[in-house]
Amino acid sequence: MTLAMQLFLALSLVALAFGVGLYRRDSLHPGVLQAGQWGLIGIAYAVTPHSFRDIDASTSMLITTATAAFVLASITAGSRRQSTVGTSYHSTALRPLLFWIALLGLPVFAWRAQELASTADFTESFFINLRIALTREDDEAVTYGALGYLLPIAFVATLVELTSSNARFFERRGWVSLAIAIAYAMLATGRTFIFLLFIAIAFIALVQRRVRPMQLVLGSAAFVGVGFFGLGMLVNKVGDGMDNTAALTALDAFALYLLSGLAAFDLVHATPAALDWGLNVLRSPIAVARALGFDVQVLPLVKDYVFVPEPTNIYTVMLPYVRDFSWPGLLFFFALFGRMHGSLYLRAKLGDPRCVVLYGLSVYPLLMQFFQDQYLSLLTTWVQFGVLVWLCFRRTPASGAAA
């Protein structure tokens, strides 16, 4: 595909983002985020120096069409005439209970982290050893087990504290809860949890008008520097010391994360293969069935590396849906996700605190589409979040009857 055509499609998506923002008079609408993200990724791929493969025209057209399906579904979700007038929401007794569970469980979680790190005593760094232990896929693979449920509990406790706060940001217990959640995220070692927590907090604050968009932009720039480069160097993923090439190495790694997924997906999309018919999309429930003793095939969560020409094993959000059901499946699921995001956002704007929290959480898989699928691959995690959040609030209609 020519550079001019690639830029045209990318700029079309940027224009679509502006159009949705003007139509809905809302720059935070999920349709704006979706079209803007893929438009900017396309522009970056076209104009920044890199050694990745050229993107095929069919891949760019597929991304453009799927994004349009997402946007259309998001802007037609629900009605702006819906109202919550006369309805109030109150936090339940689960709100403080989650806080105390997270607080009291943290020492046990930290003890388990130390125990896991000792099984991979390859370096002098606790975090590197812990990361190795948690990411091995051989017979020596280890996990937090049931203690892993403490992480979503800590996250929900923090997000509910923010949503319910009468202060500008967190109240006192909320700040403590935030520190606890960050501790859990650090002990989980993956950037996934740090980014998930930050993105959810940021968009909850935006929806509730606790911060201004420009404040978020500046804060995000600082957070990316700390979250990506700082944590990456902590677990030895980017950089090699603090010499003169460290910054360049980190920037190269950042470019690899940002653009290599698109190149890898294009390579897979251009290679004919038999469809998997749900093995990727339904991996989470299949894994649960396997854990319950059923003899079923579970595809590995970590994908094989391909060379584009740099080695990478990230393939954008689109891989499982195309692998399972080709382009019709991708269009269907993108429309489904767009509908979900649009509905959550509308209800969040109308004041439903449950949807405020859930929308904040849902922005994470939306903004990580350039990287990999975080929708159905984390299905069990989203179910846990949804149940906990819903139980943290009680809806009281005008009549006074609880619902």
Residue spans of the language-model regions?
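Short helix-coil transition sites and intra-membrane helix breaks within transmembrane domains
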Residues: 191, 310-311, 401-402
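Hydrophobic alpha-helical segments of polytopic membrane proteins
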Residues: 61-64, 167-249
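Alpha-helical transmembrane spans of integral membrane proteins, capturing the lipid-embedded, hydrophobic core
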Residues: 39, 105, 178, 197, ...
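Small-residue-enriched transmembrane helix-hairpin modules in multi-pass membrane proteins
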Residues: 129-144, 228-342
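Membrane-anchoring hydrophobic segments
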Residues: 1-175, 213-214, 336, 341-349, ...
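Interfacial segments of alpha-helical transmembrane regions
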Residues: 94-98, 218-222, 273
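Active-site beta-strand/loop microenvironment that shapes enzyme catalytic pockets
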Residues: 180-188, 193-194, 200-202, 318-346
